Amino acid sequence: MKIGIVLYPTFGGSGIVATELGKALAVKGHEIHFITYSQPVKLGELRKNVFYHEVVPSDYPLFEYTPYEQVLTSKLVDVVKYEKLDVLHVHYAIPHASAAYMAKQILQSQGIKIP
C-alpha cells in the first residue's frame, strides 16, 4: 500500500509513535510518505520506499500565526493525487485531522476517493 502519515515531527510521544509505525510498515514493504513541516526526528535516513513531503507554512502578514491548516490541506491534496496514496494515517485532531477532512472533500469533488 501507499500510505501517507501526517504528524508532528518532534520528540513528543505521538510523533515518535507515528514515525515508528511508518518505519515498521516500510520494512514490511509498504510505501510510506511522511507529510509534515520538518523531517521527523526519529526517521533517520530515507529508504527507497520512505518519502518526506515538507509542508512549508506561508508567511501571510494579515495573520498573527501562519495558516498551517490550509497549507497542510493543499499539500495533502497534492501528495494524494501525485503519489496515488491509498490511505492517510493522521495524528492529532487539530490541525491534522481537520486538514485531512478538508483534503478528502476536495479530492472527492475531483473524483478521487481516499478513506
PLM-predicted stretches and their roles:
Residues M1-V41, K48-E54, E83:
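N-terminal subdomain of nucleotide-sugar transferases
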Residues I32, K113-P115:
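Hydrophobic/aromatic residues located in beta-strands of well-ordered beta-sheets
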Residues V41-K42, H96:
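Short secondary-structure capping/turn micro-motifs that flank functional sites
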Residues L62-V87, A97-S98, M102:
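An amphipathic, basic-hydrophobic alpha-helix
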